[in-house]
């Protein structure tokens, strides 16, 4: 699956391609790698999207590669960092939320999407081990639409939160899925659209049916429209699962600028006091600098 992702990146970045291979060659290579996994029959979609993130359905038939997390091994503080503030009895910092513009864009496409409640949370009663605000409501956007401060202006990302509200440890035991079958289906939909092999709608329909949705108009127009729709679908399905940077950038700076940076910076609900203005300087947003320590010690790096 990882090799298919590499071929997809190469297909959309001519400066990285081997001179002997064309864009379509790379799409075909990606298709072969992804299709082999699909045809193996080893994986399938779980019926309940939320079960992928509640700790009760680990190493499921949908999981292709999954990190094994153990509270006793103290090998992950994901839950502490992602669990909303005072959502559980202790060690709930809620450092990571989702930009309100991302939530709004999702709801605009799929207002009845079954993925919404598993992905975002904005309304709950506080749990804090008996503190004075125990049981008080805590509401952020969109439940609290005022967006009066940064603390309530964006929904929390709920996928990686600890779901046991009595939990007090800074570590927990919820595994982290790196690659899953739904991602593979979206990849095959994107690849098939580029190859124009007629298979694209079938793959994305499998993913959408689980969420109670059907392909929207963007999937039914033309090749360019389908491309934009499937790139959005990665975000709706996989938000916060570690692939956002890769998917947002792999079609190049111009696509990233139009469909991520400008979409956020120019959205009608942008509020300077609580929204971050995204940097649009290509040299600063497309590449990560090589650390000086690596430059000084890795003799295999070119000058």
What would you call each of these model-derived segments?
Residues 78-80, 84:
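Glycine-rich (often Gly-Gly/Gly-Pro-rich) flexible segments and glycine-rich loop motifs
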Residues 98, 106-108, 113:
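Hydrophobic helix-coil surface modules that form long, contiguous segments used
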Residues 84-103:
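Short, cationic low-complexity segments
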Residues 1-78, 114, 118-303:
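Acidic/polar-rich alpha-helix caps and helix-coil junctions
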């Amino acid at each position: 699956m990882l090799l298919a992702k590499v071929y997809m990146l190469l297909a959309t970045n001519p400066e990285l391609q081997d001179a002997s291979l064309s864009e379509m060659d790379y799409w075909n290579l990606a298709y072969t790698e992804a299709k082999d996994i699909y045809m193996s029959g080893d994986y399938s979609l779980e019926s309940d999207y939320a079960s992928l993130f509640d700790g009760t359905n680990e190493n499921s038939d949908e999981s292709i590669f999954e990190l094994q997390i153990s509270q006793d091994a103290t090998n992950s503080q994901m839950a502490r960092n992602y669990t909303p503030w005072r959502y559980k009895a202790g060690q709930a910092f809620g450092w990571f939320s989702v930009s309100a513009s991302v939530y709004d864009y999702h709801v605009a496409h799929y207002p009845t999407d079954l993925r919404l409640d598993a992905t975002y949370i904005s309304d709950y009663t506080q749990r804090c081990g008996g503190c004075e605000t125990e049981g008080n409501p805590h509401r952020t956007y969109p439940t609290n639409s005022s967006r009066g401060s940064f603390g309530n202006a964006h929904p929390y990302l709920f996928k990686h939160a600890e779901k046991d509200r009595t939990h007090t440890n800074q570590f927990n035991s919820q595994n982290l899925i790196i690659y899953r079958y739904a991602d593979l289906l979206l990849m095959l939909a994107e690849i098939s659209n580029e190859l124009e092999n007629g298979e694209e709608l079938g793959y994305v329909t499998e993913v959408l049916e689980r969420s109670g949705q059907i392909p929207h108009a963007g999937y039914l127009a033309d090749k360019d429209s389908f491309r934009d729709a499937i790139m959005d679908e990665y975000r709706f399905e996989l938000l916060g699962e570690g692939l956002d940077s890769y998917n947002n950038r792999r079609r190049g700076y111009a696509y990233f600028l139009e469909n991520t940076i400008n979409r956020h910076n120019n959205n009608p609900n942008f509020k300077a006091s609580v929204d971050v203005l995204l940097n649009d300087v290509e040299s600063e947003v497309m590449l990560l600098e090589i650390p000086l320590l690596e430059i000084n010690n890795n003799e295999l790096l070119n000058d």
